[in-house]
Each structure stands twice: as structure tokens, then as C-alpha cells.
Amino acid sequence: MRIGILPLVVKEVEKNVLKAVKEHVEEFYSRFGFKVETLPPETVSDIFFSYNPIRGQFLGRFFLMKVAEHREGFSAVLGVTDGDLYEEGMNFIFGLANPYLKAAIISLARLRPEFYNEKDGEVLKERAIKEAMHELGHVFGLAHCKNPICVMHFSNSIIDTDYKGKNYCERCLNRLKRNLEGRE
């Protein structure tokens, strides 16, 4: 069983962030028999039509569909982009997932400390790990959790992301174990 991590590059997806995400996902999901690999980066030139110049953002579902194109041979594929994403009815999204597509995408744009005039560069890695674990949880059948420190708690703002942990609470972990039992 494999999880792929696909960099979808608008300008730059930092290698150190990809490495941190890969290491954490691998450390956690290896207990279920998953191997994690980083795929070669891809540009978004073929889905640039999803860019809304008025908002300065990309429509996230097209990024998700591009990630899903790489799912063959993988149990899940996680896209990581530097593009600022949104969905209709929302100002922005940190990420998006679809369990039927076995695909998820996270956006680093609003996870960056400089977006909030913060200085701590290491916080980007922590935030990216949390959002990656959250979206992979959705891919593997988890819903949002009411526990504010569970990684599956919905992040309405960066404050929520910073507050929650980077792992699943006991309830979500048990549900994840059941969902992954017998998976090949």
C-alpha cells in the first residue's frame, strides 16, 4: 500500500516542507503498512483556467482532479500546492479531499506565517503536516471531529489549525483503524 505526495507548483513548493510532510505521514501511516513516496513536481499550467483574477485564487476542485490523475498504484495521493485555493461559498480553503477519488490537496498559501505577518518559518511545516493528516483522514473515510485538539477538527481559521494537534484523537484513530482493516 502506498501514499503518494505530489507537488503542484504555481511558483515554488519548498522541499523542506514536502520532506516534513512526507516524514510525518510515513511515520504515522507505516503502522498500517503504507509506504510514502514523493512524486516529481508538476506545474499547474494545464489548469490555470481555474485561476480567478478577481479573487487572486484558484478553484480547488481542479487541483484535486489533477491530483486524482496520479492515483493509479496508490491507496491515496496528496497534492501540495503553493497556490491559494478556494471553493464556491468559501473565502479560502486549506485543503480538499475526496475519498472516492482517493485524492486530497493542501494549499500552503494561507499556512505561511508571512500571510499573517508572523516571523516563525518553522510553523509552516507544522501547519502543513496538520492539514496533510486532516485531508488524508478524509480520504480514508474520517469526518470532521468535535474535539478541538484532534487533527480532524475543522479549521475555520489559522487559529484552529495552530491549536489542534497533528494526530488523530482516540475516537478518530479507532475509526481510521476500522476503515483501513483489510485494505490492500
Where are these regions (language model features)?
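Short, histidine-centered active-site or binding-site loop motifs used for metal coordination
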Residues: 7-9, 110-112, 156
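Surface-exposed, flexible loop/turn segments at secondary-structure boundaries
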Residues: 11, 85-86, 160
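Fold-level signature of zinc-dependent metallopeptidase catalytic domains
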Residues: 1-14
